[in-house]
UniProtKB/Swiss-Prot annotation:
Family: Belongs to the amidase family.
Taxonomic lineage of the native organism: Eukaryota, Fungi, Dikarya, Ascomycota, Pezizomycotina
Organism: Gibberella moniliformis (strain M3125 / FGSC 7600) (Maize ear and stalk rot fungus)
Enzyme class: hydrolase
UniProt xrefs under SUPFAM superfamilies: Amidase signature (AS) enzymes (SSF75304)
The protein's name in its UniProt record: Amidase 2
Cross-referenced Gene3D superfamilies: Amidase signature (AS) domain (3.90.1300.10)
Keyword field: Hydrolase
Gene giving rise to this polypeptide: AMD2
Amino acid sequence: MTTSKDTTKVHKPWTEVVTEKRALRDARIDKHLKSDIKFPSDGISFETVDIDVLTSLLRDRKVSAVEVIHAHSRACEAQKQTNCLTEICFDDALEQATQLDEFQQEHGQLMGPLHGVPVTVKDQFNIRGLDSTLGYVAKAFSPAESDAPLVQTLKKLGAVIIAKTNLPQSIMWCETNNPLWGLTTHPEDPKLTPGGSSGGEAAMLLMGASIIGWGTDIGGSIRIPCHMNGLWGLKPSSGRLSYRGVEVTLEGQQHIPSAVGPMARSLSCLKLVTKLAIEAEPWAIDPQLPPVPWRDGIFQATSTRPLSVFRDLVTKLEAAGHEVIEWDSSLNSSIIDIMDGYYSADGGEDIRSAVSAGGEPFIPQIQAFVNRGEPISVFEYWQLNKRKIAIQEAYHDMWDNKRSPTSRPVDVLLVPTMPHTAVPHGSCRWTGYTKIFNLLDYTALTFPAGKAPRGENDGSFWEHVPRNEVDAWNQRLYDPVTMGGRHVGLQIVGRRFEEEKVPIVLKPKCIF
């Protein structure tokens, strides 16, 4: 981390900072939960409303933007149940909603395609006047001076940001816990994790307290919580959406760039906000982005071409006329090894210095993360980069050369997201299914594939001989009773900059 405020010394005991930050957040929530103002929309359920339905209600004046935002601020009772929020901006949200209603009254139309749509963003996204802490105590009470470009774009489109959501200490873990904001729990069972690192977003969406969430993904941080909560989540290729104004741990590393992406309860919402964000031409304000516009129609043929898939969906896919071929995963272990080398390249210095600046303890998983290895030399780093490029080329060539029995090329891959459903807090250990596509920088979308069957004990699972310690750990986690009925998500993976293509593959007529 390079800016002075990242290393600001906290002179108060860290516990006092935590108490003050949480009290400020809770007061801002309670102000609205205790409001005795009644609106017609109080009786409207927004849990299943998508953007098109909501904007139609707004356009027909069956509900106002103020009513919608008021209803969703009330819905943030989700915080009381799951501890999913960090920063609260209900007052600003209601002020913006009032302006939207006034615009509609004056002009007879909505301000934009996201007019009045309640949105939450992960704690990393800068919003003027609010902290972006990354779960670090030292970053508390250091408000951002301006909105991140993506936040600016969302507001111009009419969206209303209502809150920021929790993440793990440093963001570098697949659960959601930190000493500053505390532990976020799964909406359906407080003993379980909602995943991470965008776990606060997932909890808000599952509880219907937000319609669109925005997260980040450097190893599965969008896809894992979506898998555990029955949601849709897109990890674009890095450089498709702007990361400018989004705080991040390990700032300055370019070997595995983190990606910004949306999370939603429906595919239609996910595709719409991705399209709108790209059509806003983010490269005009972020020099790190290539000018790749949204390409409607370029991948329409995808829906009639073969899919490379596995396991449970094979029968459905074949019945729908798709060719099913087995994918070669032999490169995956090397990709994971390279990723792990990058994660520990600085010997944990970045995270260690950020935690020591605040004085708080490490959560156990991050303590283990920073102790994974010693810092490497510049020469060793170059060798790691050479390995990355070589494996990217090998994977590219393998994809190009793979053919179906009728000699058709592969469109996309169907891949697991995690080796288990939502599990007890502190149990997640392996993210290999997701992070391989961060190193490859491929587009990956997690979608709700169903729920684990209830009361079925698959004896063959216990006959499996674990390949290593982590495999044995995951096997011990398996419980057919507690995992029954839990959400299961799978990944559809395309190649670089195929954000338009991946959603098309998931149209109901194509797979389900």
